[in-house]
Amino acid sequence: MPIVLPHWNPSAPLQPLRLDWLARAAVEVAVLRLDLLDPLISGNKWFKLKPHIEAAAAAGADGLISLGGAHSNHLHALAAAGRRFGFETVGLLRGEPQETPTTRDLQEYGMRLHWLGYAGYRERHRADFWQPWRERYPQLQPVNEGGGGLLAGRAWAARVELARVELAGLGWGW
């Protein structure tokens, strides 16, 4: 079943950081709390995943396939997003099969795991790397390791806009 684009647009609070030494220097600092976006899809992960989810939905894909290690925050966020929004996820993992808190979560969230070994994982930069995976999972859209790439780079603009909104809320503005 094709991905249905989620209508989920979390916001992150901008929290002023009040320290005496900053006040003496007349410096105002605030921290954009991306860790508070969501307990599982937090930090920069949502901003990197969202454009890939949107592209997969536009292409009529049923889900996403991506790469990472046995402790990958990217795969963890991807699996959590798949579970929350109801799309298929497949993880291609570096190394030999191992059980970690992350891999247990990935499986609990419904991600299918394939262990590539170390040599197989090094092949990810080859031009033909995705070919056998596209044949095996034609309904899935591939996502670069860590969610990187041009789509993710463009998503950082959303982070800037989020910061502007929060700064205006503090009365700072840009």
Residue map of PLM features:
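PLP-dependent amino-acid enzyme catalytic core
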Residues: M1-W174
